Amino acid sequence: MGQTVTTPLSLTLQHWGDVQRIASNQSVDVKKRRWVTFCSAEWPTFNVGWPQDGTFNLGVISQVKSRVFCPGPHGHPDQVPYIVTWEALAYDPPPWVKPFVSPKPPPLPTAPVLPPGPSAQPPSRSALYPALTLSIKSKPPKPQVLPDSGGPLIDLLTEDPPPYGVQPSSSARENNEEEAATTSEVSPPSPMVSRLRGRRDPPAADSTTSQAFPLRMGGDGQLQYWPFSSSDLYNWKNNNPSFSEDPGKLTALIESVLITHQPTWDDCQQLLGTLLTGEEKQRVLLEAGKAVRGNDGRPTQLPNEVNAAFPLERPDWDYTTTEGRNHLVLYRQLLLAGLQNAGRSPTNLAKVKGITQGPNESPSAFLERLKEAYRRYTPYDPEDPGQETNVSMSFIWQSAPDIGRKLERLEDLKSKTLGDLVREAEKIFNKRETPEEREERIRREIEEKEERRRAEDEQRERERDRRRHREMSKLLATVVIGQRQDRQGGERRRPQLDKDQCAYCKEKGHWAKDCPKKPRGPRGPRPQTSLLTLGDXGGQGQEPPPEPRITLKVGGQPVTFLVDTGAQHSVLTQNPGPLSDKSAWVQGATGGKRYRWTTDRKVHLATGKVTHSFLHVPDCPYPLLGRDLLTKLKAQIHFEGSGAQVVGPMGQPLQVLTLNIENKYRLHETSKEPDVPLGSTWLSDFPQAWAETGGMGLAVRQAPLIIPLKATSTPVSIKQYPMSQEARLGIKPHIQRLLDQGILVPCQSPWNTPLLPVKKPGTNDYRPVQDLREVNKRVEDIHPTVPNPYNLLSGLPPSHQWYTVLDLKDAFFCLRLHPTSQPLFAFEWRDPEMGISGQLTWTRLPQGFKNSPTLFDEALHRDLADFRIQHPDLILLQYVDDLLLAATSEQDCQRGTRALLQTLGNLGYRASAKKAQICQKQVKYLGYLLKEGQRWLTEARKETVMGQPTPKTPRQLREFLGTAGFCRLWIPGFAEMAAPLYPLTKTGTLFNWGPDQQKAYQEIKQALLTAPALGLPDLTKPFELFVDEKQGYAKGVLTQKLGPWRRPVAYLSKKLDPVAAGWPPCLRMVAAIAVLTKDAGKLTMGQPLVILAPHAVEALVKQPPDRWLSNARMTHYQAMLLDTDRVQFGPVVALNPATLLPLPEKEAPHDCLEILAETHGTRPDLTDQPIPDADYTWYTDGSSFLQEGQRRAGAAVTTETEVIWARALPAGTSAQRAELIALTQALKMAEGKKLNVYTDSRYAFATAHVHGEIYRRRGLLTSEGREIKNKNEILALLKALFLPKRLSIIHCPGHQKGNSAEARGNRMADQAAREAAMKAVLETSTLLIEDSTPYTPPHFHYTETDLKRLRELGATYNQTKGYWVLQGKPVMPDQSVFELLDSLHRLTHPSPQKMKALLDREESPYYMLNRDRTIQYVTETCTACAQVNASKAKIGAGVRVRGHRPGTHWEVDFTEVKPGLYGYKYLLVFVDTFSGWVEAFPTKRETAKVVTKKLLEDIFPRFGMPQVLGSDNGPAFASQVSQSVADLLGIDWKLHCAYRPQSSGQVERMNRTIKETLTKLTLASGTRDWVLLLPLALYRARNTPGPHGLTPYEILYGAPPPLVNFHDPEMSKLTNSPSLQAHLQALQAVQQEVWKPLAAAYQDQLDQPVIPHPFRVGDAVWVRRHQTKNLEPRWKGPYTVLLTTPTALKVDGISAWIHAAHVKAATTPPAGTAWKVQRSQNPLKIRLTRGAP
């Protein structure tokens, strides 16, 4: 238990600081959270073997790196810094990584060389691969085709063309005729091929063996190695689709390469690695291994045979032999077989169906795409006649909609071939209407539709007018007839009642309210609401439809449908929610119209319950139940005398359920049975008590609540926060329900608070929560009377073991709010569908109001008071809305539960039937599990604590301690266990989670898992409290007798306050008993308590030592512990540390009073009475007073007549501090003597006698836990108390006027202290108190070097005093000078000049030997100064390397141009270092993709491929994409030093020139379009003379740019272009007269000596931090120099080169220096110093 496994990921997290430092050295930045995410979740998905816990295997890291750096959309550029840092950790592991890194394998040779083998026999010829053999004789060296790069340039006109290849000599053919016959067919490579392949010197080995392989026949018949060039691989990769997209094409390419190039095993791996991904390569190798056949010709699975034919590791085949070449031929054949098998993708008809014809795509082009999809995603050949039908059907179905519909209507479609279908489709495609025709047709249709609509509206208006006339006529006729009947028959009214006649029984003598015949008693229960059918109308303001009708639940709302067998589809008239895009044409009596369908919510149920998609017809008079839904229901309609009845197929009533699609899963869920199912009788017998049957509750006996405001309160109005559509729709049903129930009403109020939608965990449901914090601040506070759950269960006796738990539903809503208080809780709500736009407020007590729990708890308690009186044998506990009823038997519990439910129903409260626990012996209440008179922690409570992750912040730690603290009664010693965690919760404390915190965290969780069962407190029995104390922590267990055993009731623990923690053990036990007795009182409820402890503390409490306890604390302890009616002390017992219960054997008791008497003082013989035979009797005093606004202080030690010691103290010293200093000085001067010392300071006297020892035990802390004042002086006094042989410190009154010895001595000491305070302060240190004896210099030790130097300076030696004297001062030796100056420098780290000025200003009594040299050495070797101080290093100017001809050496850089225009914000600048020619391209992004695109599309076609590129370390240049492209093209990309723009000086200066020119042009032209003005800026840059007087244009083209006057009439003469020969002659002249002299001049600059920097290999240097944070040193290191150049350094630990101007030398102390130990002011600390040599 407690052990953890260290993984690479956890190791890096433990050393995260080192990881960040290594990442910074790699010029990247990493974050811990993303580090963990990539390692544990992202990289394992690459399927390259990366484990979730990380690895330091370089092979796996390189595979992950290749995936991360993959170009295009498959790459992961955001993961580049993290994998680069992983690789740096594994490649150059720090000490904490080395044990986890496997040793590196020996490096493989970069160029494989064949060992000399035996002479090969003439091989047999192969039909596929021609056999090539080695020549026996050596051939002469081949003539050089291309000139040397360092030689002179080629004369393009005079030089002869390069020679062609030389044919093999005749002697070679004579020596081996067969070989000659074989090789005659293979011609030597052409010069162009040689140029593309690269120049290589001929092998220097013996001509009988081949030093390079694979297998290219040279001119002399010898096999030579011609590897794949980077351009070949690049072209194959980019000009062909990937293997996953088109495996056939890539397989054909590889097959042709294998035949024509005859690659070796290594070249095959290189080819596969370039053209295939890692997964594709593995699949090919696996399929190739399956194709290996055994001796019987069948595929074999024997590993030895498979590895022999198709090895996965590099084999040792000798290609000079026939056997080796045969192995290679077989390997290529198997590789081709693997490619073909791996390329067979599985059948995926979904991909084929996804190929559809485009809007403007021709049918023939679509057919070709369809066939290609068949070839790629299916094993079928679309050209096969057997597949023509499938292809034809796909062509018809996936064609454009208009073409497909017409093709489906073709006659005799089965007999049509695919060609016929394509021809028909072409005809349809060509006859499509043009866009103009289509617009004209749509316009005509719209006009016709509008015309029909107007005619229908006019007809409808005429019909409406005629109907109104007929109805008015009928109404008038009815009125006339009614008047006639009235006149004939008179009025028919209810007979008038007499004054004393009852309206109910019509008898006289009483009224209706007093009628005895009228039924009395409570109103009967309301009829139970049907969950599926309602008899209401179908909508607001709408009469119910005629019979037959059925009421269904649609979207949570009841809707009454008219059963209409004539309707084909069921219809809804109200808005049913979201509608689908589908619509249908509905033809009715009044005409036809198109209506939309509701969203598809169909769910078929075997029970007859269905959901349905309805047609939304707002114009329909009634919702209709059509034939579609009646058919699915298998409904039966019976016509009887009472009317039509609609029932199911078995005669049962129909039940139709409509719900949203997201709730469909609930239909398939199995109902979760409760622990004890609530019987239906409880629901039916008490319908008014349950929320499920009684509706919303209302407390009928409670008056509306008035919420009083504070006197200074003003209305607060906070706008509603933005709310998402999902959240608004989620809380909308709740708002609607509360509006319907009258709990919410519209209002207008100056108060407004926001509504917050809170998502319920695990569901998509939201509930509205109102933010009432501002309202709570303005409402008067009331005293909370909610019970404390800590001691609530103390009122539950263990004898009551039958329980009922009820949870009131929407309890706060049962209390009404007074209308005057309702505006306080208003909030905004808008619902256009309901017509609500404004404020709503609560008519009931809202949730979130701070006084709601107290108000409801008091109201319910008052309402249930009668129930408690009527049932005294039952126990009813109430915590707000949670009720617990306990009884002794099941019958009493059922009887009491029935009475409680009846009472709740009558009072208007509603309980939740889902959460009810009725008459059970085991229930859950307030997070506890109650059973058989005991309580446990519930599993949910334990899982809550166990499920919390390791805290990372103080807030998370506080949450954990709060959750675990709820369970502290079950954890013995919880306070001591959690002690390491509490300091991290303080504000402003650094959160440092260490091993101690982790151990405490795990111990709390482990203790929670083993939490015991605690008995419920029985208030009829006495309690016993066992108490123990250890290291300032009180621990105890509260028990009660259960037969012969003690049953734990609670485990108590608490930390003592700092004052009590500093007491002796016996007094700490008193404090522990007092603390735990107070906590136990919350559970015992004032019952008798017996305290048992290992100390006899009762005597201590009755007679406490006044020196340790204050009067207030003493009174508090006595009042609590000496209450004999409630607290009694038992016998002294020895406790078990684990259980805190008594042990069988007892230890010998001790007397606490004796122990306190022995430990109350600091020195046992210290007394306050004069010693008769004292050697000295001294008087001490300290003085502190204000004079001229400055506080002066002094201290003195005197006798009655003379001053022994007096000293002025620093300004601001207090009188108490001065008294301590004086008393301490007296004790030091009386070392080894008998001393009587008098002081008039109560503070110094009490510190020496009493408080000093208390402070020492308490850790020098006050009672509030703060550090005491005068800490150093008190420590010095406590130390000096033991110096005299015998000591008596006596207190005497101050400022006495008598003539006694005490009075004279005190006055003398007071006068001496005041006089000393008036003098100048010589020393500021108050702890280095000097002796009263005269000053004598210390004894110096001079070395031989010191003596030699002293003799040279003319110093004299003082024989009497034993030291050398120079200039009248004692000479301090070199070593002592170093120690003094080193201590002085470390105080404030001044500069050498400041130290010299300080020493010159202060007159030193010594002559310091070699002072200036030592000061310089101390400041140079100070590590803090070296890391912070700036450096003034001056480095000489270097020489920039330039190209030897145009286009070979470029510098590139990005520069930002503001303001951006058309999205162009950056300018990519290329500068040719030879000519100064500049190319600039405006770009929108500063990325590596832009750099490579411009390089390949602009620079390369115009100037050729560069040999060298220089740039800074920007992300676009240092990225893997740019560097990989440069490596592939053979470009040497030089990254300049970081933060050194001078390294890219040419391109940086060009950036400035371009931007300055653009600024001038924009000002002159008045336009901001710098992109338009860029060519003019480039023209100026290209035609500005350089340092040699030539412009870049002249250097490149050999002549100035042509300047043409377009107004010159002779301009036509200038348009004649010179011939090609003239151009070449001019180019030759440029080469001879310009390029060669410039190249020579640049070379001369390189040959000139450059003053290098002073750093050498092996030096230690500090490296500058270019980005420093607050309080972070300016320099980092020191680092060791590994490599140097004239201007840069390479140091150990940083990958990039560093410019010499960014480092400074680190002075390290010599190895011969010795360490010395020095004392410090703190007696618990020492100082280690190292002196100068």
UniProtKB/Swiss-Prot annotation:
Covalent lipid adducts (N-myristoyl glycine), residues: G2
Start-end of Basic and acidic residues biased regions: 449-464, 484-497
Regions annotated as coiled coil: 436-476
Residue positions binding Mg(2+) 1: D807, D881, D882
UniProt-annotated stretches for the region Disordered: 139-218, 449-497, 511-549
SUPFAM superfamilies: Acid proteases (SSF50630), DNA/RNA polymerases (SSF56672), Retroviral matrix proteins (SSF47836), Retrovirus capsid protein, N-terminal core domain (SSF47943), Retrovirus zinc finger-like domains (SSF57756), Ribonuclease H-like (SSF53098)
Start-end of CCHC-type zinc fingers: 500-517
Chain residues that bind RNA: Y721, D771, R773, P787, N851, P853, K1054, K1055, K1082, S1184, L1186, R1242, R1266
Protein's name in the database: Gag-Pol polyprotein
Organism: Xenotropic MuLV-related virus (isolate VP35) (XMRV)
